[in-house]
């Protein structure tokens, strides 16, 4: 019983770290990756569709992305979605492709993005701690109901604390890497 609770908690913690990785990937650094377009949704035949499903991306320069829609009729919709997104870029359309030139990140904008990254990391840490709290409550309930002994309960809590520390450390490492990416010019 306790092992099942620990396994479920670790799976949820792993998911929290995965969400943090995705959040960090969507924060722009000095070099552009297609991941910055991850949250951009295009109104495609009435359905919000991620731009990454509608187009290919080519990065000829560190600050330029060329978007080539698979369906040429969606060119205008893709351009509009990119323009309306919070990426801070003005796409140009030449009839077959869309060019997006990203401005150089100012020092202030870099600091703002570091704050955003720290906020995302803290959200992940809180999520991991909440998972720990729920798992600890479940372990306490198992011990209280007599389904496991107190020694087994303490061992389970110790394992849970180790897992919590391990996953929080992963989030901290992801944050450290993202901060160094953002602050390197």
Swiss-Prot record:
One BP term from GO: translational termination
InterPro entries: Ribosome_recyc_fac, Ribosome_recyc_fac_dom, RRF_sf
Molecular function as annotated in GO: ribosomal large subunit binding
UniProt cross-references to Pfam families, sorted A to Z: RRF
Superkingdom of origin organism: Bacteria
Cellular compartment(s): Cytoplasm
UniProt keywords, alphabetically: Cytoplasm, Protein biosynthesis
Signal peptide: none
Coiled coil: none
Stated name of the protein: Ribosome-recycling factor
Organism whose genome encodes this protein: Parafrankia sp. (strain EAN1pec)
Lineage: Bacteria, Bacillati, Actinomycetota, Actinomycetes, Frankiales
């Amino acid at each position: 019983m306790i092992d099942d609770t620990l396994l479920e908690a670790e799976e949820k913690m792993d998911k929290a770290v995965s969400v943090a990785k995705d959040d960090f990937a969507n924060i722009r650094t000095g070099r552009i990756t297609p991941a910055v377009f991850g949250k951009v949704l295009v109104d495609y035949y009435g359905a919000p569709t991620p731009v990454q499903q509608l187009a290919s991306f080519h990065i000829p320069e560190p600050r330029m992305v060329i978007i080539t829609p698979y369906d040429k009729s969606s060119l205008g919709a893709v351009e509009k979605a990119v323009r309306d997104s919070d990426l801070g870029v003005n796409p140009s359309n030449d009839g077959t492709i869309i060019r997006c030139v990203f401005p150089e990140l100012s020092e202030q904008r870099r600091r703002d993005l570091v704050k955003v990254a720290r906020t995302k990391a803290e959200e992940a840490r809180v999520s991991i701690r909440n998972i720990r709290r729920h798992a600890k409550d479940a372990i306490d309930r198992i011990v209280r109901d007599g389904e496991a002994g107190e020694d087994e309960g303490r061992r389970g809590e110790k394992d849970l604390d180790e897992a919590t520390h391990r996953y929080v450390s992963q989030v901290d490492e992801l944050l450290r890497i993202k901060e160094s990416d953002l602050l390197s010019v």
